[in-house]
Amino acid sequence: MADSLKMGNLSLNESQHAPAAPPSNGRAAYIPPHLRQRTMGANVDGAAAPPPPGPAAGAGAWNGPRNAPRGGNWANANASDFSPRAPNVPNGNNSWTPTEAQRRPFDPHAYGHPGHGGSYGGSQGGSAKGSGDGQWRDGKHIPGPANARLERELFGVPNDPTKQSTGINFANYDDIPVEASGHDVPEPVNAFTNPPLDDHLISNIKLARYQTPTPVQKYSIPIVMNGRDLMACAQTGSGKTGGFLFPILSQAFQTGPSAVPAQASGQFGYGRQRKAYPTSLILAPTRELVSQIFDEARKFAYRSWVRPCVVYGGADIGSQLRQIERGCDLLVATPGRLVDLIERGRISLVNIKYLVLDEADRMLDMGFEPQIRRIVEGEDMPNVNERQTLMFSATFPRDIQMLARDFLKDYVFLSVGRVGSTSENITQKVEYVEDHDKRSVLLDILHTHGTSGLTLIFVETKRMADALSDFLLNQRFPATAIHGDRTQRERERALEMFRSGRCPILVATAVAARGLDIPNVTHVINYDLPTDIDDYVHRIGRTGRAGNTGIATAFFNRGNRGVVRELIDLLKEAHQEVPSFLESIAREGSGYGGRGGRGGRGRGGNATRDMRRMGGNVGGGAPSFGGSYGAPSGSSYGGGAGGYGAPPAYGGGYGGGYGGGSYGNPSGPTGPSSWW
């Protein structure tokens, strides 16, 4: 065998326990790694073993003894004036030089304030380096620099077809009657000015090309800015989202962030905290609606210290948690996912100044009342006297107003127009069509109107949505579908294709019926009429928005006679033509009792009036409501002896079309079938 193998001047047949021996033709002795770097005895030639050679200058490797200081070149390790590196040797990849001990001073603003978020600086308003966001510094709001790319993404360009613009009848909104009840109601504003709004918010409103506040905004802005609670009812498409975002963001820009509670100070580490402390919370029933509100919040918080976040079920919770960790000042959430994050200890409500319930009646209809009560009353949210609470919706039936007593204090009731009514900008047509003829009539309508605008078709079941969209595709009509069984990614993709016009026909179930603001919808077709007239109102409200005109067509047959009387009233109120077959079916007597809408609540003559102004006690409620809850003369609530008696039938209000599982399990917000 060849002479003993040497590595790094270490002979593999050396031993720590015996004198070195001449090379042997036998097997080399194994030396454990932890013994190889010790000072060696004589080598095979009888000379002292030199120290192991160091790496080449700048190589960055470390081959020195284990107990020696780390460095690069160890060739002169025995010299009295040894230094790990010669002064003129350039640094290597990982090599250390004495000059590196002089570190740069820590900049607390480079990555946001420690423990207070990231790119937006979280609740303390620091700004991530190069993020272009604003800051709150020394008691002042410092807007960030403009970002042309982000402006195009948020606000679009003039005449952008994907952004809603005001239509030819927008000026007619000034003729809509407004009723504000409560004591000391502030005077409305007629323009976006300072005061009361912050200058930075006004600049963002101008970027969005909003020129005049809508009626609900004219009243809600001064009401909220004066610290009052609000219950606002307005027609769909009338600017309710801006009605609560404008005053909340304006106050935030003027007053700055809230301090994180002292007991949370031990949670910080490496400039980031795991628990978020938002100051504003907006709850909405569906994923699509919270995403839409979040997009609006991003617009009007542009270049500010406020960081909006959105959380909802059906999406990756990991990415949502990372978003929250980067800073969360304004949180838009569905109730189920918010309860989940509270249980995980990732969100605290202790700093909440503003609580907004959007589409509040729909959230209660969908079984969210336990989650909402837990969020509002069972967690660490400030009580009703220490926060402002705002309720916005297009309808507020009586029992919802009664529930508001627990959440609101000394509130102003704002009613814009006849709440729950339809816009006169929408031309409503009702066609008598039997079920087996619906497809052929639909094709006739689509051929007649073409695909110049966006057409939204509402059906009652998820199976029908898929079947009808497949049928339209087979007939060479570009169609897609959206319903509760589709994944979040599929739904977002379908909505994006519909908004952009690449797929101008969308078949939808009730998941898209309320709250969604889809620009340039010119035609809404109720392929299946809902069993609740309020759902009909919200479905056709997807067109005729912001003063634009639109067409709504409904397929009616005797299977829909339960809503015939309310449908006739709705058509008359909006000055629409009432077909003779509706009148004849109504005279048959089947339409005068009905279910009264929404499982017994019904619309009734006063469903949109402030209950505090009506004499009568509401089932032992607060004294300010006084009297009895019986129906006023001439109106029927649920058709039951003129009274309210029947409990809300949340499960049966949709004719069983959703099979009990369309909305998932309201009591299990994190279940796999949950779509909120």
From Swiss-Prot:
Residues 56-69, 664-676 have a biased composition (Low complexity). Its EC number is 3.6.4.13. Keywords: ATP-binding, Cytoplasm, Helicase, Hydrolase, Initiation factor, Nucleotide-binding, Protein biosynthesis, RNA-binding. A motif (Q motif) lies at residues 190-218. It catalyses: ATP + H2O = ADP + phosphate + H(+). CDD domains: DEADc_DDX3_DDX4, SF2_C_DEAD. Residues 1-144, 587-610, 655-676 are annotated as: Disordered. Residues 425-586 form the Helicase C-terminal domain. GO terms for cellular component: cytoplasmic stress granule; spliceosomal complex. PROSITE patterns: DEAD_ATP_HELICASE (PS00039), HELICASE_ATP_BIND_1 (PS51192), HELICASE_CTER (PS51194), Q_MOTIF (PS51195). ATP-binding RNA helicase involved in translation initiation. Remodels RNA in response to ADP and ATP concentrations by facilitating disruption, but also formation of RNA duplexes. This is ATP-dependent RNA helicase ded1. The gene is ded1.
